[in-house]
Amino acid sequence: MTTITRARDFFAPKLRHVAQFTTRQGIAVAGNLVYGLLCVRILPVADYAKFAVLFAYMGSLTVLLDVGISSTLGPLVGEQIDNLPLVANYVASLRRLALWVYLGVSPLAAICFVLLVQKQHWGAAVVAQMLLVLLVTAWFARVSSSYGAVLILRRDRAYYYRVQIIGSLGSLGLLLVFWLLHSVNIYVGILLNVAQDISMAFGYFRRSQHLLGVKGEPSAQQERAILHLAMPNVPSSIFYATQGQLMLILITIFGHSASSVANIGALFRLNQILMFFSQMNPILVHPFFARMQEARVRRNYVLVVSIVGILVMVYAGLAFLYPWLFLWILGPKYNSLSFEVSLVILSSAIQYVAGLLWMINSARRFTYWWNNLSQIILTLLLEGIVVWKVDLSTVRNVLYLNIAGATLTLLINLGVGIYGFIVGPQKLESPIGPDDLGMASPEEHAAG
């Protein structure tokens, strides 16, 4: 076999997976990325501060309302995916649990939101409107999670991604129409996003009804099974739900003006550039290392992490040398953030490598009971010390904390990898694979 033939056989399937990602999930992710960046450029700073806080809080609330419940459908059904009444009953049980979680969490979340934004002096009417949007959208996001899990379970990924693409490109197209008509304001930016979430929820609901063909009945026994499987992940779900938006929450609490909030919100939109590429890790990196012969793992582990590390550091270096490239993306309202934009790109580069390490470690079953525990304890300790000792009213100090947290995550994941090579992987006790669970790093779940 010639070198060219070997190279073709190696790269052809991977390029095919990249093409599938680009034409499916990648389009939806890119559409949402462009939508968010356009809102940064178009909306006034004061309005974008509201936009950023609302959707950051919504992202955390969506994770808190799920706490891993929807991801239990695959493991509980197992190989009985053709037993449609069983699947329908589990979905009905999921929905009833979701209702109880929503009724329990949403009032507390509403109170916390009011306390969070009270320093911004946005007025009772504005905060009430934001709460309405928050609670309505969070509910439909839960509907999407429950019924979207049915499409994944029944391997109807084409329709699953089609709903996302239509919603993403539809909202982006309408935003462009309003922009051409010079009619974009904060209400347009928010309501188009809400419409996207609602359309996705209805799309998944209708498709799941078609796939199942039967109406399920909830049962206490199935609800107990769901909770039994989901409860061990609740602490980490809560932790990552708050961590994903922590920097914006901190600047909202400690910042002196809405411009500081808008600056952090705009800067963190740039994080999503690398997040777009991290979506390919479950498609390319995870199966590549999961199927690799043990003798080849160590060399390829070092090689892949080194190459990716060099590439993302070059990317971060561009931000320090040519910050105007990224400032142009944000628009002229943020031209004063040349050093801050370099810091946020550096943190996103570190987070990308940390996520890559997590993905490889998961593929090789380098997962241990102390892994998440040490991540949570050390991160909370770091953040507690910084909140106590550092003035977090400035954008720059908040970004320094973000870099420190990303570096800590990187070091922990690197330590887990080294430990895995020394001690060995966890013993496989379950036939459930990553495709059944929708493998993604905790950082990606939180940001998503």
PLM regions with names:
Residues 139-163, 290-291, 346-373:
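Membrane-interface junctions at transmembrane-helix termini in multi-pass inner-membrane proteins
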Residues 17-29, 54, 63-117, 129, ...:
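Membrane-water interface segments that mark the loop-to-transmembrane alpha-helix transition
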Residues 128-133, 161-210, 374-381, 393-420:
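Hydrophobic alpha-helical transmembrane segments
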Residues 48-56, 131, 258-269, 338-342:
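Small-residue hotspots at the loop-to-helix junctions and early N-terminal turns
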Residues 1-14, 158, 162, 186-193, ...:
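Interhelical loop/hinge segments that connect adjacent transmembrane helices in multipass membrane
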Residues 115-133, 258, 321-349, 396:
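Interfacial segments at transmembrane-helix termini and the short loops linking adjacent helices
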Residues 66-82, 152-153, 212, 271-295, ...:
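Helix-loop junctions and terminal segments of transmembrane helices
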Residues 16-36, 164-171, 188-208, 220-286, ...:
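Transmembrane helical elements of multi-pass membrane transporters/channels
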